[in-house]
Amino acid sequence: MSVVKAMWDHASVDVWIYLQLIIFLSVFYFFYLFKDNIKIIYFILSLNGPPALPFLGNINYIFDKHLLFKMSHFAYQLYGPVFRIWLTIFPFVVILEPEDIQKVLGNPRHVSKGFLYNLLHNFLGKGLLTSDSETWKSHRKIIQPAFHLNVLDKFIESFNHSARKLVESFLSAGDCTNITYLVNDCVYEVLNETIIGNERQPGSKLLNSKDSPFRQGQISLFYRLSHPWLIFNYFYKKTEMGKREDKHYEALFKACKNKINETKQPNDDKNKNKKTSLLEFMVKIKSTYPEFREQDIIDECCTFMLAGQDSVGSTIAMTLFMFAKYPRWQNICVEEMNEIFGNDSRDPTLKDLRDMKNLEMFIKETMRLHPSVPLIGRVLGEDIKIGKHIIPKGCSVLIFPQSTHRLSHHYLNPHEFDPEHFNPDRSVRRHPYAYLAFSAGPRNCIGNKFALLEMKSIISKVLRHCQLELVPGKEKVVTKFRVTVRAKGGIFIKIIPRIQSHNS
């Protein structure tokens, strides 16, 4: 019996040593596996930032209707140029100073966007906006030629055609007009032709597109963040919202797939001046890049159609509102149109649009105070030094253009609307990363020239035919925070036919 007990005791010691070894190795492996995350958490805890709730972090800020105001007016003063926030259990470093932002956005090692953008895959697909760094590099190289200036020149006729329809809609809408829906219809019609390649609708009415999958769907990003278990697709796809999103993406896929099949059909049209939509361009170039799949074409079309509508539409509507609010600048820009066109009622050319310097200053100032994209995210590909801080590799960084655009040491009277901020004499002395309306660096908005030409074409057409005034009782626009910034309840303007000395 004593022999058995001795053997048992010896075995117990061996088992105990074995268990200790397993525990030690497990702990060691855990720390090895998550050493970067532990380093990040340790760094995050050393930073200043707004008070955070356990497990929820600062997610409640996302639903604060005054968030944009607080971020633009008080964040820098309260927390400085570098601080931390928590979105549920996920930490982020916020940087506001342009020279620090340049170290992130201007460095090709930091082009990865991180998990926040992954939550948009179900809605936008994996296009240039949301894709990982390697996919982005490949797609950007392939798509870039489609946005060269000589290609964009052929799209200006499409911009002008839809702009004429928008003016007709404005003039027939009455004194108090919610311009938001009409502007969105106009932008959609432009994108429907230039991105997808659908034929324009004849007549003077804007395209009725309420049933299009490109005008439907709901972005669930912030809802999922406020319900952390829904960050995981396994759980999210079992919810009603997840099922609706999947159904919506199926409709988007089908619409793009049908157009791709149509584009592949033989075409005898040899007109060299014919516009080539982005979808047609990608279908043609696919044979040169075998790694560029049909699914990639669909994802890119979804990205440009869905993201382009929100950003361009909201900016045009806000710019028109600002013209109503600042009649002196409205007169300045109308006079600029008169100098360019004289008594000629023709549509603008590329040269005309590029000559609209005052209009461009006005649009840029609108986008400075009201950027359509409220945040830019990156994941660091290596450690970087910002001020006294060494921010570790793998850390998620957020940039808030709304805050950076209102730094008093970069903009005189930063909270005041003043298009002279973009007078070339002032702009040349300003840090290039102090203005982020189209992001900046290698992963900036590929369609920024397209968007600016589209906006100038549409807005100039409106100014030449319409006098814009504020509607009593609707002199303020309340913005709401989404993936893009939108006007809550719409934007209302009084539209009066402009008296002209020439045939319009």
Task: Describe the residue ranges of each PLM region.
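Conserved cytochrome P450 K-helix/beta-meander segment immediately N-terminal to the heme-binding cysteine loop
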Residues: 110, 399-426
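Cytochrome P450 heme-thiolate "Cys pocket" and heme-binding signature region
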Residues: 124, 307, 425-455, 478-482
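Cytochrome P450 heme-binding "Cys pocket" and the immediately downstream C-terminal segment
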Residues: 201, 327-329, 448-485
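Conserved cytochrome P450 catalytic core segment spanning the I/J/K helices
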Residues: 60, 148-150, 188, 225, ...
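Central I-helix of cytochrome P450 enzymes
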Residues: 187, 191, 249-256, 285-339, ...
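Cytochrome P450
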Residues: 2-27, 86-93, 150-161, 171-193, ...
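N-terminal membrane-proximal hinge/A-helix region immediately C-terminal to the signal-anchor transmembrane segment
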Residues: 2-138, 153, 157-168, 382, ...
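Conserved cytochrome P450 K-helix E-x-x-R motif and the immediately C-terminal K′/meander segment
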Residues: 59-80, 254, 258, 347-387
